[in-house]
């Protein structure tokens, strides 16, 4: 579940400031054992081949040394990357200014039934997502609702094809509202609490 009172759409007045700004790809959170951070960087590099002035905004706590090593090895111009740490409230504000969120997760058995919190946070802010297949219901939600790109493999040709779709998706005037509606449908904290309460009540009645 996601706090959709915090992770919400940017106001129209703030949104007007986004005009004429470069495409911003956002990476928020861990780069640890479950995440394929280098695959995310590779995808960003391919985006830059199509949109040379695209920016990468990374928000992370505790992994900056490893991130900088990966950036150096990738050949990405660090002038196009903003790497920083923010508190929880500021993270939500920063995500509102991103055009697309990216995260790649190792499709391990332990992740089959999981759902990344950051998906709900990005969608709550009206930001479509790029991710890989094999993680919970994430692929079905993104594909069925048209709120991002799901990679079935890390093949370069598939990535390039998905980028063309992604760039069209970002220009869709309805995409932000569609992302927000998807977050409300699948990630509402209030609905999640109510669901758990109903489960506990039903268990109590059986005891």
Regions found by a protein language model. Give the residues of each.
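Nucleotide-sugar donor-binding and catalytic loop/hinge architecture
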Residues: 8-24, 48-49
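Conserved donor-binding/catalytic core segment of Leloir-type glycosyltransferases
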Residues: 17-44, 57
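Nucleotide-sugar-dependent
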Residues: 35, 84-85, 89-94, 101-120, ...
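Short beta-strand->alpha-helix junction loop in the catalytic core
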Residues: 1-8
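A charged, aromatic-enriched C-terminal amphipathic alpha-helix characteristic of glycosyltransferases
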Residues: 154-157, 170-202
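Conserved donor-binding loops in enzymes that form glycosidic bonds
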Residues: 1, 27-33, 60-61, 84-85, ...
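Nucleotide-activated donor-binding/catalytic signature segment of Leloir-type glycosyltransferases, i.e.
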Residues: 22, 60, 65-95, 100
């Amino acid at each position: 579940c996601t706090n959709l009172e915090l992770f919400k759409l940017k106001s129209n007045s703030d949104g007007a400031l986004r005009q004429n700004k470069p495409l911003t790809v956002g990476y928020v959170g861990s780069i640890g054992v479950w995440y394929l951070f280098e695959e995310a960087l590779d995808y960003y590099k391919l985006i830059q081949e199509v949109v040379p002035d695209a920016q990468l905004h990374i928000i992370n706590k505790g992994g900056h040394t490893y991130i900088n090593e990966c950036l150096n090895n990738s050949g990405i111009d660090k002038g196009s990357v903003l790497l920083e740490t923010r508190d929880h409230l500021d993270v939500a504000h920063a995500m509102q200014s991103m055009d697309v969120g990216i995260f790649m997760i190792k499709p391990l058995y332990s992740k089959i039934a999981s759902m990344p919190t950051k998906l709900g946070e990005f969608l709550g802010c009206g930001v479509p997502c790029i991710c890989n297949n094999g993680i919970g219901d994430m692929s079905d939600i993104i594909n069925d609702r048209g709120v991002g790109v799901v990679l079935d493999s890390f093949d370069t040709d598939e990535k390039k094809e998905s980028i063309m779709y992604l760039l069209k998706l970002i220009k869709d005037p309805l995409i932000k509202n569609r992302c927000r509606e998807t977050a409300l449908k699948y990630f509402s904290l209030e609905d999640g609490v109510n669901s758990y309460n109903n489960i506990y009540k039903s268990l109590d009645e059986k005891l």
